[in-house]
Amino acid sequence: IVMNFDAEKVKNDIVEWIKDWFNENGKGCKGVLGISGGKDSSVVAALLVEALGKENVVGVLMPNGEQFDIDVSKDLVEFLGIKSVTINIKDAFNGFMNEFKSNNVELSTQAITKDTIAAAISISIITSLNWSKNL
């Protein structure tokens, strides 16, 4: 059991750390992050908005084809008032899967294999957008 946990202090410390990091490493840059609508990306997005201002945060929505819960991500972006970009990763994902198949590569049937491929695509997208000239 954690005693005397001060959530407000922890949040403020994180916000200050984000400000310091951007001042030292990316002054004038925007925070670009993937928005899934889940707890993790929602909390990080809110912390970035508090630290950098909503005009300096860009949310990236990356559905893999049709995503039944994409509205949760859109609602978060709207609530925070941040700019967003939606990049559908379906074609890239299917391209990888087709290349594996055409080369007779049998992937594990575990969902984690497909999740790993989708995550790698997402990281590439966010990294590329991080260098964008017009976001």
Residue ranges of predicted features:
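ATP-dependent adenylation/nucleotidyltransferase module used to activate substrates
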Residues: 1-135
